Amino acid sequence: MRTSKKRGRESKALGVGPAAAVHVLKSGMPRALGVRPISITRKRVVAEMRVKPIHINRSGRVNGGALMAFADVMGAAGTVANLPAGYRTGTLESKTNFFRAGERPVMRAVSIPLHIGRTTMVWQTTIRNPDGQIAAIVTQTQIVIPAKS
């Protein structure tokens, strides 16, 4: 990833494609969450999140916010895998349906695109417990904008 000086601070040039999407899932928030990429293509993102004590609510289950954050980084990674050069993304809207409590030790998510457009992409992420039962399904819209804006 190349860097450039802009307004007195260093900024990293944004990569695109599946390789850049792997980087998305290995840095910042995903790393703090304990996300581990399994496979990334332009049509499917698969990752796992090792449940940590910080993810647990007072009932001993995975906090809904942790599941939403997991899904958010999955949709972002899928979008990055499909971005044209010189563009970036951000979450515009996210909707979560919870079906059951999240369980330890590892949750698995699969994201698939519902729409890949020029200005927006919509991703659906299904998060499953270790027993394969669906804990949540998240649908999110990602905006596609020039990297300089």
In which residue ranges do the predicted regions lie?
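Terminal targeting signals and extreme-terminal segments of soluble enzymes
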Residues: M1-S149
